[in-house]
């Protein structure tokens, strides 16, 4: 039976100011817009919260409990006591959902989540790769200064549901591969405390992927010894670096449990070595017979390391790197900081040479270069850094993971929703169509 949902209007009052212990809800009722979805798809849970006197509980922060565990971002109730929570559901089978404010808990609703098949183009000559962070945990990268709030909330990279949901999103967009960022692990002996957390998150990712019928392949990007490399005068390798490379090879790449998950190129596993930022001049010469090695810099439009075969983390103007007269690698991004090495990094995003998202214009224009170059490896910058100085605000950012569109009065910035998810899915599909049409 449907209940009539009454509302109140409080002119000129921010309803977030009303969220006090005395006004916490005593009753929460929910309903869902769907009872059956495919894995990774969204439902909307509509909730209404009332105080003990029966009036709407305005400004109360609600969050979901799915199969007994917290899931997703918090949503505030409106002056009517209503909130609409958008929830992706990654786990197959029956998902039992309740909503709580930490005091009262709603009735439950059940949504059945079914398997899906994704039409991912498998073209080893034109791979599309998302730059991906798995660093969100208690001792590595924390939350609190993100430029926008992910739909999944302030999640942990150690939560298998998060890893699975990200993988399902990558599948839906059409990605072949994710690039895992291991560039910050060697400021002390390997494995450092943060390195151990990175290992735990990577263990989980490989385990989750191994259990999925469709998933992206994996590619590592590592950094230099002591997290320091400026030019050929600095040593890139050392005992910590070598220990980490051995660990990656033995634990993941050469592990029979994870057969066929890792990317190979020119007959060997591909390993990316980050040059610790934008640099000029040639890269170091690192030799390891186990790997095909490529180096990654940034801002090639100014540094021009592509002439030495260096790939890019991102560019203001996408600049392809060639190998044997063919475009080998290119990176496109939806936003970029300025390329001024004379300034502190926290000023890069507010420099007049920086480029914001601009409602997708930056991203779409960079994709045009990819359409023309058609590289062997097309990198997309990026999914989810969410920390300063790498991101500045909602526009001056290059994160793409779906984020909340917040209501007026919510102190959290209103993000970009699924805009860059949708653009990416459409551009990848168009990219493969164009390649196929010219064969």
Residue map of PLM features:
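Exposed beta-strand face motif in extracellular beta-rich ectodomains
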Residues: 43, 93-97
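Edge beta-strands of extracellular beta-sandwich domains
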Residues: 104-115
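Short, solvent-exposed loop/linker segments at the N-terminal edge
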Residues: 35-41
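Glycine-centered loop-to-beta-strand initiation motif
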Residues: 77-85
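Beta-strand-rich structural segments
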Residues: 41-53
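Glycan-processing catalytic domains of CAZymes
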Residues: 114-439
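Short, ordered, surface-exposed loop/turn motifs in non-cytosolic proteins
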Residues: 55-64
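Surface-exposed, short loops/turns at beta-strand junctions within beta-sandwich domains
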Residues: 87-93
